[in-house]
Amino acid sequence: MGKIALYWNTIKYMKPSQIYYRMAKKIGLRCTIGCIPDTNYGDVALIKTPVDFDKDPVFLERFDADELLNNKVTFLHSSKEFLWNEKWAFEDQSALWNFNLHYFEYLFSMLSAYEKTGNRDYFDKTIFCIESWIKENPEGEGVGWSPYTIDLRLTNWISYYCMTEKELPTEFKVKLIESIHRQFVYLSNHIEKDILGNHYFEDLKTLVLCSLFFQDSTMLQASLKAFKAECKEEILSDGMHFELSPMYHKIIFEGLLRVIVALRGNGIKETELENLIQPMLDVAWSFEEGLERIPLFNDCGNNIAKSIASFVKICKKEFEITPHFKSNLEDSGFYIYKWDNWKMIVDAGQVGPSYIPGHAHCDAMSFELFKDGKPVITNCGTYGYQCEERQFFRSTMSHNTVMVDGVEQSQCWGAFRVAKRCSVRVLSRNENAILMELIDQKKNILNREIKIEPSKIIITDTCKNKVLKTSLHIVSNEVNINSAMKPVIEVQQYAPEYGIISNITVYYWLQKNKIETTVYLGE
């Protein structure tokens, strides 16, 4: 019965369309947006791309051009020797690592090295890598033909083509364009309507870019209509992406900017989409302004999305838009406090969209604290998806929050599943305090108040006749912790970036009815 209940409490939140398309895919039916690309295509168009994303120094540093030249690839802090003209899959690496192999983001590191040094070997290597992929990845076989990997690869290949078209050998250009079109057609028949969320967004974004690239007006009309509708669905009124991850917010924002820049370059101005730029930039800026890394709420890591500087640069250059700080993100439930050289971000949001909470953590009422941009009190991060550590990093204990009677806030299971969920609401808030109420998966009701005073933060957790467990994860000696009872101090796993784990000190308290903790701030 337990397993039946688990599945029921997961499935009941899904849209009927998701269940239908999941079953349709199982029996091999197509999943389209009601339109597929023209099989006959002529000349391609050099679409305008926001090259500052592909030339973002922080992004380029993730890939070593010399390693790539010498047949070594590194993703998510894990390296492999790879000859390219062999099977594009490593069973000893994670699914996410293998996905990254197929994204082709590393092309731009080699292009940058070529631009800086004039060494043609880097440029020729990009051609060899693409040719090898085309040869070694037959249509529909392996993770390289997963719709999400197609999305990112085609986005990168189109940018690559538009940046290098004049230098590419004619024979290779023909081969590259042919492969892009084949993948475009395949993607259009395998849209992720069963998953939705950021996956569906990326599918639609890629269809729009490919439609512009192949000058397919019928496909452009259909894909752009669907893309606009999905933006309306996924972008909240405060500008935050509805999956409530600062990292995925930037990934989605990048996709939106790529579409708008490409449309503008084609003489198409979509005001409805362009009106999203300012609020989405404000959200990204408000999270990261003055910080050395992205805040760790829900699935998040510092080595995936592009840098905040690249977003600011592109928005200014392309649209004359500059960011504004917002302390209240009421629709998404994030509240940001700044004073002196301190910054605190509080999460009072829901689990995420009810039908796709796959990137959710048990981090309700948690917070992160920074001093001079450096993390002081932090959540534990994400590390990976299909790994044994997944459950820990999604758990309540890996966040600076509270649980009752040992009950997880929400019932996270598998890599991307949530069954019973908590709910959160803000009872009151002002410029130096917030009072929140959480109802966990077992219907326990608990309150948390966070008060900021000149030299301290007071955290008060209450739940009548229940045993509370409050956790704080400390990465700096910039604070001192005090409570009426002595804390238990342990070492836990910490992953501010995907693919690498270090240690963090966790303080936790167990007490009935009420726990009050004071964080004294250093000078």
Language model regions located:
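CBM-like, beta-strand-rich accessory domains located in the C-terminal region of large
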Residues: 1-2, 10, 151, 197, ...
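Residues that flank catalytic or metal-binding motifs in active/ligand-binding sites
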Residues: 102, 203, 333, 363-365, ...
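Aromatic-lined, polymer-binding surfaces characteristic
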Residues: 95-277
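Short strand-coil-strand connectors
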Residues: 76, 338-340, 372, 405, ...
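Carbohydrate-active enzyme catalytic cores, enriched for enzymes
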Residues: 236, 240-378, 427-433, 505
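Extreme N-terminal leader/anchor segments
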Residues: 1-83
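Asp/Glu-centered strand-loop micro-motifs enriched in Gly/Pro and often flanked by an aromatic residue
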Residues: 73-98, 111-117
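Short, isolated positions in well-ordered beta-strands
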Residues: 80, 342-344, 376, 409, ...
